[in-house]
């Protein structure tokens, strides 16, 4: 019996696999502090078309481009194979001030696989904020795309839902997998889930 028990213990030890590390959050700012501003163009009115480059995680920079009544978000990896390439992923009227990165800790430190950014739409015929949607964005070195969206007003605990959505799709393949809406589907969420097709 002791031998059988010892064999069972050895088999259990050999066959047991540690569960995957749970997703964690890290926050970075896309507010003015820590970001670099650069005007685009020299024509009258171009001061409204401004590029803001902010530090991110995983070797990424987060770029915020104000285009009059539109604002778009993009990513760039300055130490990647295409250091000057910007991949624009989502746009709306405005955006929140932080990027919520989802990832895991490994021997190299924190490795993000997703970024969550609050995108804001303008309330019709007013200068106020209307619908707000969390854009869930796949991020990897040189690769990024919208993989889903969660409407803040239509879902309770929208942040928690967006975290679970990002963690469940951490291996999302840009260009092959289709983005979806998490939780309650709304027109605003569908719009964000489409991402930006043209670069």
Annotated model-derived regions:
Residues 15-19, 73, 181-184, 188-189:
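A sequence-level detector of short, solvent-exposed, charge-rich linear segments
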Residues 62-64, 73, 97, 112, ...:
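Polar/charged alpha-helical tracts
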Residues 3-5, 16-87:
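Charge-rich, low-complexity N-terminal segments
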Residues 35, 48, 52-56, 132, ...:
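Functionally engaged cysteine thiol sites
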């Amino acid at each position: 019996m002791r031998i059988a028990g010892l064999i069972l213990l050895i088999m259990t030890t050999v066959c047991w696999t540690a569960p995957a590390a749970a997703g964690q959050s890290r926050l970075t700012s896309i507010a003015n502090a820590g970001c670099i501003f650069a005007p685009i163009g020299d024509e009258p009115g171009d001061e409204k078309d401004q590029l803001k480059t902010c530090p991110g995680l995983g070797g990424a920079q987060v770029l915020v481009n104000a285009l009059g009544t539109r604002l778009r978000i993009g990513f760039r990896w300055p130490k990647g194979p295409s250091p000057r390439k910007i991949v624009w992923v989502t746009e709306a009227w405005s955006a929140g001030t932080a990027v919520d990165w989802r990832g895991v800790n490994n021997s190299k430190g924190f490795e993000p696989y997703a970024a969550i950014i609050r995108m804001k739409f303008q309330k019709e015929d007013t200068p106020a904020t209307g619908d707000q949607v969390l854009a869930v964005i796949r991020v990897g070195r040189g690769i990024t795309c919208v993989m889903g969206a969660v409407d803040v007003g239509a879902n309770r605990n929208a942040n928690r839902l967006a975290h679970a959505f990002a963690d469940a799709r951490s291996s999302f393949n840009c260009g092959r997998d289709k983005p979806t809406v998490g939780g309650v589907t709304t027109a605003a969420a569908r719009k964000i889930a489409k991402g930006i097709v043209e670069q």
